[in-house]
Amino acid sequence: MNGHLLLLGVQGPELTAEEAALFRKLQPAGYILFGRNITGAAQTRKLTDDLRDLSVDEPILAIDQEGGRVTRTKDIAPALPSANALAAKGDTLLSARAGMLTGDQLRLLGFNLDFAPVLDLDHHPGTQNALRGRCWGRDPQRVIDHAGSWNRWLRKRSVRSCAKHFPACGRALSDPHFDLPVSDATLGDLLKEDIIPYTALMPELDAVMLAHVLFPAIDPDRPASLSKRIVTGFLRDQLGFDKHLVLTDDLDMCAIADRYRDNSDVVAAIEAGNDLAMICHRTERAEAAAKELGKLSSYATEGAEKRLARFRKKLHGPLKWSETKWEAVCKEIAELAAQVPEEAAVLPNSPVADY
């Protein structure tokens, strides 16, 4: 079995005996937590500690903590401002402070990887494509300035970062949680605009997440997340992201789950050049997925295993838990949020904010 090429979700706020046994057996690369796992600060820290205790190697402990409506700690702490609200203020120092406080918050809770910043250009700001409020803007330089400042200070707080959603989920006109978006953008279109933030920030990024978007002009058969042309040919070989950890977005989204059966998505992800396949919700399929990955040749997984080992060496352990420190960070977050109010808007009906 190749469980170490999986990143898995957890079902609730504490591990069940069955989950603990499964995770101990599979030894996945790590875990992602959502709002369903977070009911209190001390409880969340215990959960991340328990997951660490199950792992032979330091596990990836990840979360989507972007700010705004994608704030997994919204039930236990004030929400940090969204990327859109921060960039609208035009002050990169505010973006830097948001990154710093995100890092402080996550390390106290036991996380070592944040699936942020979003580097998608906001091509369709009013569209139901799951990204409303989550992008730093339409202009690549604005994204570089603000996402770069945010990312730099997150990493200075010893939390690793993951840019998303490569190559350009901002081109999507629909929500991959519901269906597979299709974009007519060519490789030239992407290089002209969407890829600029990735290449500009390359030395400061730890990981890259692939989008569930189909680009027929580049690969008519596979979405970006499962496309060898995009993952290996474009991201790694052409752009030079050959040292970064690369992983799929959640393979349980309908964009993928409705089209791939019997864990063929997991195999396709690794064969495409991803290092990790992410299963966030249907963890009951994790053991079967690991068995399918075990059928891959060592040649097919060698690069992923090397990059994962290198990535693990960059992970930092959690800060010593302190209720006093937690309350102090929450107070600073509330003060920043008061400086950067969110625009009142009708947000799209996407599950992204509810997990």
Q: In which residue ranges do the predicted regions lie?
A:
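Short, conserved phosphate-binding/catalytic loop or strand-edge motifs used
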Residues: 119-130
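Second-shell residues forming the walls of enzyme active-site clefts
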Residues: 9, 36-54, 59, 69-71, ...
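A generic, well-ordered mixed alpha/beta core segment in the N-terminal half of proteins
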Residues: 75-110
